[in-house]
Regions:
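Acetyl-CoA-dependent GNAT
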Residues: 46-93
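A short, internal acetyl-CoA/4′-phosphopantetheine-binding micro-motif in the GNAT/acyltransferase core
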Residues: 70, 94-106, 131
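Conserved acetyl-CoA-binding loop-helix of GNAT-fold acetyltransferases
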Residues: 103-117, 139-143
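A short beta-loop-alpha structural element at the N-terminal edge
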Residues: 14-30
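C-terminal "cap" of GNAT-fold acetyltransferases
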Residues: 154-184
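Conserved catalytic-core motifs of GNAT/GCN5-like acyltransferases
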Residues: 129, 145-162
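A conserved beta-turn-beta hairpin within the catalytic core of GNAT-like acetyltransferases
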Residues: 84-93, 101, 105, 120-124, ...
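Conserved beta-strand-loop-alpha-helix junction that forms the acyl-donor binding cleft
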Residues: 127-138
Length: 184
């Protein structure tokens, strides 16, 4: 059965995902409390210490991977998490990009997540939820082949299978032409 494993770094074409550290807490706090992000994510406690505590607890735990999205040798652009393994499926979320992130960052970071989960961790599907009012994001996922499993309490719940993920990896190959390199 697949399991979610942390990685120190995952390099893509122009982006890298690196494991979060307590030093990233200020960036994460600012990102999560920005007006553009806060409208579409779960509430963030109003103090930075809560974010530091969350990251510290994550580092001690297992069963999740939490990354800072950045240009390969550049400053942080966003965050993404893999969590909630259910058999062959994993959840991903906390996917937040700065408003001024390069246009390719959304597609490439999603491809990196799928490539890591399927090719390196052994998953064959994903599940996640998106707030209904966040049309830009749920439309993005639907273009990748995700299907709405249900909707309730202002959320759409999605599933995407291995065939749809493989089709998206092929369709958007120009954003990740050489796959990924994982450093544990």
């Amino acid at each position: 059965m697949p399991q979610i494993l942390k990685a120190a770094r995952i390099d893509g074409h122009r982006l890298a995902l690196r494991d979060v550290a307590p030093a990233d807490s200020d960036f994460i706090f600012a990102l999560r409390t920005s007006a553009s992000a806060a409208a579409h994510i779960s509430a963030t406690p109003p103090d930075r210490q809560s974010q530091i505590d969350y990251v510290t607890a994550y580092q001690r735990g297992s069963g999740a991977a939490y990354f800072i999205i950045c240009e390969r040798d550049g400053p942080p652009l966003g965050t993404v998490r893999l969590y909630d393994p259910q058999g062959e499926s994993f959840a991903w979320g906390s996917w937040i990009l700065k408003a001024d992130a390069p246009l390719f960052a959304a597609i490439e970071s999603a491809l990196i997540v799928y490539c890591y989960a399927l090719d390196h961790l052994g998953f064959s599907a994903a599940h996640f939820s998106v707030r209904q009012e966040n049309a830009k994001v749920w439309q993005f996922h639907e273009r990748f082949g995700a299907e709405r499993a249900r909707s309730e309490a202002g959320q759409y719940y999605f599933r995407i299978g291995g065939a749809a993920i493989a089709a998206s990896l092929a369709r958007y190959r120009r954003f990740l032409p050489n796959g990924i390199t994982v450093t544990r």
